[in-house]
């Protein structure tokens, strides 16, 4: 769909194994390469975070000769990549100081969490500072705004244009999409899930009002550590102070076990999505905020459909 009239194409490189980034980046031959973090996705094939780093940085072999690399400088793995093809990497992060031996070129301070209304932060750049109004909830979206700022500057946008662009961002279905229906707020974040994004979404829910209900399903492709990684999410639920957890799936039982450590959190576990949804529909009421999140194969958009059906 890219035509001569288009000036810029932004492409997400979705990978789950070694060699896939080589194939995709060879097609794209990017002028700018961005890696936002080295999380815990696709461990089944990639083994460790070092494996994930290796697979994602295959991109560097296919950059244009004068290409630019932009990395999250607060990530312990990415911060080791200080130079690519003889050119310094552009680093971004939260706070001017770094826990690693790098200089952040673009960074955020004065971060304010306004719940579902989004985030605010002061973003500092070599071209000047600006106040960013980020209309999507979650502290992780401050990092996304920083990455966008870095790309915008490389493309020659002004600080004002970048600030306007951040303020006008809109969500899409399955990606922290807020739905207001039947007096409830549904946070539709069910396109996919991994341990890092799951914790970020739970944090978003924890900063909302009303009864806070997490509806979670299994996370896939996590390899030998899958049970422990699911238990860690259950611990995050318990620590978050949310009011209720509904979960379904084979591994989601680990969420339930750990979440019960907080007696203030009502825990409901069912083996199947259908059974869980039936119980959930009988439980929710006006004023509730409901987060829905799971890996794609769990088909949790059907849960969102059930919640929002008139």
Give the ranges of each region predicted by the language model:
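ATP-dependent carboxylate/acyl-activation modules
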Residues: 173-175, 297-303
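Switch II (G3) loop of P-loop NTPases
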Residues: 7-18, 186-192
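Short acidic-hydrophobic, aromatic-tinged amphipathic segments that line or gate anion-handling sites
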Residues: 267-276
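Active-site beta-alpha connecting loops in nucleotide-dependent enzymes
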Residues: 172, 190, 194-263, 269
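Short amphipathic alpha-helix with an adjacent loop that forms part of the alpha/beta core around
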Residues: 277-283
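Acidic, Mg2+-coordinating active-site environments of NTP-dependent enzymes
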Residues: 34-186, 210, 235-244, 252-266
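Short SAM/SAH-binding signature in class I
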Residues: 8, 32, 147, 285-294
């Amino acid at each position: 769909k890219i035509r001569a009239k288009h000036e810029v194409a932004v492409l997400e490189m979705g990978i789950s194994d070694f060699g896939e980034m080589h194939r995709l980046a060879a097609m794209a031959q990017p002028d700018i390469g961005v890696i936002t973090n080295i999380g815990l996705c696709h461990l089944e094939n990639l083994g460790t975070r070092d494996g994930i780093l290796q697979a994602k940085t295959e991109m560097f072999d296919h950059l244009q000769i004068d290409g630019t690399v932009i990395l999250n400088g607060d990530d312990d793995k990415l911060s080791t990549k200080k130079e690519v093809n003889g050119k310094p990497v552009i680093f971004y992060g939260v706070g001017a100081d770094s826990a690693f031996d790098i200089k952040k070129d673009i960074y955020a301070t004065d971060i304010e969490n306004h719940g579902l209304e989004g985030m605010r932060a002061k973003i500092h750049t070599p071209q000047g500072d600006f106040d960013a109004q980020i209309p999507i909830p979650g502290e992780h979206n401050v990092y996304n705004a920083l990455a966008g700022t870095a790309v915008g500057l490389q493309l020659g946008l002004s600080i004002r244009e970048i600030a306007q662009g951040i303020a006008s961002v809109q969500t899409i279905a399955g990606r922290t999409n807020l739905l207001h229906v039947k007096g409830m707020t549904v946070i539709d974040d069910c396109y996919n899930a991994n341990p890092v994004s799951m914790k970020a979404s739970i944090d978003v829910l924890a900063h909302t009002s009303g009864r806070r209900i997490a509806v979670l399903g299994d996370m896939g492709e996590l390899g030998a550590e899958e049970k422990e990684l699911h238990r860690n999410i259950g611990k995050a639920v318990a620590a978050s102070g949310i009011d209720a957890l509904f979960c379904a799936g084979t591994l989601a039982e680990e969420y339930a076990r750990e979440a019960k450590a907080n007696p203030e959190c009502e825990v409901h576990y069912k083996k199947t999505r259908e059974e869980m949804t039936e119980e959930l529909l009988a439980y929710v009421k006006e004023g509730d905020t409901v987060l829905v999140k799971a890996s794609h194969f769990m088909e949790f958009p059907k849960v969102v459909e059930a919640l929002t059906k008139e």
